[in-house]
Structures are given as C-alpha cells and as structure tokens.
Amino acid sequence: MGIFSIANQHIRFAVKLACAIVLALFIGFHFQLETPRWAVLTAAIVAAGPAFAAGGEPYSGAIRYRGMLRIIGTFIGCIAALIIIISMIRAPLLMILVCCVWAGFCTWISSLVRIENSYAWGLSGYTALIIVITIQTEPLLTPQFALERCSEIVIGIGCAILADLLFSPRSIKQEVDRELDCLLVAQYQLMQLCIKHGDSEEVDNAWGDLVRRTAALEGMRSNLNMESSRWVRANRRLKALNTLSLTLITQSCETYLIQNTRPELITDTFRELFETPVETVQDVHRQLKRMRRVIVWTGERETPVTLYSWVGAATRYLLLKRGVISNTKISATEEEILQGEPVVKVESAERHHAMVNFWRTTLSCILGTLFWLWTGWTSGNGAMVMIAVVTSLAMRLPNPRMVCIDFIYGTLAALPLGLLYFLVIIPNTQQSMLLLCLSLAVLGFFIGIEVQKRRLGSMGALASTINIIVLDNPMTFHFIQFLDSALGQIVGCMLAFIVILLVRDKSKDRTGRVLLNQFVSAAVSAMTTNVVRRKENRLPALYQQLFLLMNKFPGDLPKFRLALTMIIAHQRLRDAPIPVNEDLSVFHRQLRRTADHVISAGSDDKRRRYFGQLLDELDIYQEKLRIWEAPPQVTEPVKRLTGMLHKYQNALTDS
C-alpha cells in the first residue's frame, strides 16, 4: 500500500470526521456564535483523537466517552479560571503564574489517575490558562467568555457524537467473544508448558503474552461498557473473568515453580491428561470434563492444590464466558461467582514521575509567560496556549518527546495548508455556506485518512490548521494576524519540546523499585488472620502493576520473574490456614508496618535499614509459626518468600 493510498476500511471514519466538522461549522454560523472555530476544533479533536489512538476507526462509545470527558474538563477549567480571576484580578502577572501552576497541578493529577480519565484533568489545566490569557484586555467579560467557550465546546462534542451515531460505529462485542475463546485455549497451552517443565524462556514468553492479552481484554471491557447500557450484565461477567484469567496464569506459573523442587507432586495421571493437544475452546471443555472426573476419582487430597485451583477457575471461566456471549440473565450460580471478593485498588507507583510532569508543565508555561512579556509579541499568548496544550497532553503518554515532535510537524504542515485556506479557499467560499462546508469537509476527509494511519503530524496538523484559519463571526482577513497565529503555534511547540528535553525524567528506576517493593508488601500483607482482609482481591491490582513493570522495563526477565514470584506468594499465603491467635495477629500488623516503611523510605540507607528489619522479623515469624505448630501449607510459602527476599535484597533496596 502506497503512502498516499486510501484503504476501504479508512473511508467510513474519514466521512464521519468530515460530517462532524461540517455539522459544527453549520450550527456555529447558523446560531451566530462569536467563534464557531471552537465548535469545529472540538468536533475534530473529539472525533479524531480516539481514531489516532486506536490506529483505525474507534469502537462504539469511544467518541462519546471522550466527549463527556472533554465537557467535564472544560467545566472544571472554566470554574478554576473564574476563581483565579476573581481572586487576583488586581495582579495580572501573579494571576497568569497561578494559572501556570494550575496547569502543572492538573498534569500531576492526570499522571496518577486512570489513563482513560486523565484527559479531563489535562484539558482542565490548559482551559483555565486559555481563558485567563484571552481576557487580559477585557477582564470584565470573563463570565461571558467562559459561558461562550463552554457552549461552543458542547456544540462541537454534540456534533461529533451525532456523526458517530449516523455512521453506525463498530461494536467491540464480537472481538470480546472471540478473544474470550482464544484466551482460554492459550491458558490451557500455558499449563501444558508448565506441566512439561520445559524451557523457562518459552514459559516466560507465554505467561507474559497472556498478561498482555488479559490487560487488553480489560480494555475491551471498558469499551463495551461505554458502548451501551445493554451490556451491563456482560460487563459484570467480564470483570470476574479478568480475575479468573489472572488466577489461571498464577496457578500455571506456580505449578512450574513447584516442579523446580518437588516434581513428584505432579502425578503421571495429570501429565498424561495435559499431553493431549487442544486447538479450540471445545477441546478445552472436553479436557476439563475429563479432569473433573479424575479429581473426583482420586480425591482432592491426592490432587496438587495448583491443579485443583486451576481446574476450578477454568470451569468458572467457561460458565461466565457463555453468559458474556449470550448476554442472558445472570443465573444463581453466576451470581455466586460474581459476588466473590471485593477488588482492592493499589496506590500509584508513579508519584515521582507525576512530580516530574508537574514541573515540566509548570516551567514550560512560566517560560512561555516570560517569553511573551519580554518580546511583547502579539502572538505570544498563542504560543503560551500551545505550550500548555502540548505539555498537558504529552505528559500523560509514555513518550512525551514523540508527542511534541508530532505537534511540531503538525504546526509546520498547518502553515502552508492554512495559507491555502486563508488566502484562496475561504475568501472564495465565504459567501456560500455550502461551498464553505464542502471545503472543510475535504480537509477533514483527507486528514481523517492519515489520522487512522497514525501518520506523524496528522493529528497536530488537523487541530493547528482549524485553529489558524478564519472561522470567526464575522470573518476578517488580516494576513499579519494569521501569520502571527501560525508562527505562535510553532514557537509554542518548540518551547515545550525544549523544556521536555531539559527537564529529564529519571524516575524510571525509582518507579521500578517502588513497584517491586509494592509486590513485597502485598505478599507480606497476605499473612493475616483477619477475615475481611483475607477476602480482599488484590490480584487485578498486582497484575496491573506487573503490566506497568513490563512496559517500563521491556525484556527485563529477572524483574518480571521476581514480581510474579511475589504474586504467587501472595496468593498462596492468602489461602494458607494460618493459626488464629493474638500473638500472630500483633506480629502481622508489625510486618505490614515495616513493609510500608520500606516503600515510603526517602533514602537508600533508610530503605536498607527497614528492609533488614523486615527480614529479621520474618525470621522471628517463622520461629513463631513453629511454636504455634503451623502446618506446612503455611511454613513452606513463608520460607520461600523469606529466601526470595534475601536473594534479591540489593535489587529491592538500591536506587
């Protein structure tokens, strides 16, 4: 396929984007809005953003969800701007500086919340800055400007959603059904590898791939939930299926680790059962039936606990999978599974990274303010707006430098493209609404094709071109003003890029260490006799952290193995029959406090001291378990955990 070719699957979304832009333009001029450009720009960004992220037409619900986030972010930003202006109207410089700090604060928050919701916080940061900068000459018009901006943005979002509904968006349901089947087959094949106890690298690749696929399925669940309220039952089942899939991975990997020291635990009967190859979910179903019969014949005590748990989880997976595919009423058996254990959310390990993002956004906005005041450039405010937009959006993504480069390419491409529209197309079409709409529809169509290909600069070019062409009411054509706006965008993106290069993010190693220590803390916290605490389901949170670790350190197998071992230890200790008495309960609380001190320690020396204290306490705990005659199901996992912590002490304490 050539660089300028158009694939059939890209045409529908390109038409959808063109329709959203035309609707926003027509409504903006029909209702005599002062700046219809904001409505058009919002419609374009809301529609094109999910397509750029997905690398194709987004699934149903994605555009609506992004639109709702944009409305929320805009209202938060407008309220913040009004509060800042009312409080500091007599000190304009201080007012702008506080807005810069507000933009940084919103970026900090957006770095800590879920990636889907971070868009609203990033938007609220630069919305307040845009309002404060725009009303510098006429501060008394602030409420009117904020209201107009909110109205125009709501109109733009409404147009994007209407266009999405008109062109029958894709449903993700079929993809979910297909992935559920494939995932169960892959889970069975992973257990086959673990039973064979073959090459460790092959096993690592298999479970790593399953962790990624389970995370992707959770993302599909979020999309399905946004799509329609009729998938509420499927959404509940998919939440439980996420935990079951992670349980299957954990039990398979524990089976592999057990065979390192006690291969005789896996009997020949189960080895023969797992030698049968499977290709489809029906094959897996037949094999599970055979295994359940074997377990009934041999008895639960003669079955390795990991295999017994794996077969039970796979059976529940099959039951819920059928319910997701049919979307029927939830049965009593399913309800019992769904009413299982409350899922625990873990604290973010990226606090230092979030603080770096705060300083990047704040410093770049302050630098833009100083540049504007020092040069007195009429488009310095435009440069400041671009700085805030780029840094607020770039900081939420794994590679902010590439986002900045995308914006730089986009603003550079917008200069000749905007020039064509400003000098030739719009002056010759402004007398006819039909021709004006057609001209912008052509722009939206062709950029919509490139956005789906994730062409570098395409998203930036779309937003920057609409921002600089004359779409105000009434239209005025001042070439110097156009050139200033175009150059202001380019300068703003370049200043943001310079700040991102200068303020380096060295938080990667710290984040990795915090993640590993959080795994240790989770394993330690599983040693409890508190019934409520033992029922807490930390597995999704732990695997979410493991997925983050895999993204931060691709290919670092020792880190992944250590994290997985801690997850296995957590699950085993959580189900272990720990003796119930006050002496052990008090010591459990002491162990948790020490583990928390390891995570929160501000220096390597403190961390080493607390970690050494934790190891000493674990030795004392083992002695207490011996005194209280704890069974091997308790003492062996604690011994394995203590041995792992001794072995990896340096990796868990050094920066």
From Swiss-Prot:
UniProt keyword Cell division, yes or no: no
Cellular compartment(s): Cell inner membrane
Chief place of localization: membrane
Topological domain ranges for the Periplasmic compartment: 1-12, 59-68, 114-120, 173-369, 428-430, 481
Gene Ontology CC terms, in alphabetical order: plasma membrane
GO molecular function terms listed in the Swiss-Prot or TrEMBL record: transmembrane transporter activity
Cited InterPro entries: PHBA_efflux_AaeB/fusaric-R (IPR006726), PHBA_efflux_pump_AaeB (IPR023706)
GO biological process: carboxylic acid transport
Membrane topology: Multi-pass membrane protein
Keyword Transmembrane in annotation: yes
Cytoplasmic side of membrane: 34-37, 90-92, 142-151, 391-406, 452-459, 503-655
Membrane-spanning parts: 13-33, 38-58, 69-89, 93-113, 121-141, 152-172, 370-390, 407-427, 431-451, 460-480, 482-502
Key words, A-Z: Cell inner membrane, Cell membrane, Membrane, Transmembrane, Transmembrane helix, Transport
Function recorded in the entry: Forms an efflux pump with AaeA. Could function as a metabolic relief valve, allowing to eliminate certain compounds when they accumulate to high levels in the cell.
Family indicated by similarity: Belongs to the aromatic acid exporter ArAE (TC 2.A.85) family.
UniProt protein name: p-hydroxybenzoic acid efflux pump subunit AaeB
The species this protein was found in: Salmonella typhi
Gene from which the chain derives: aaeB
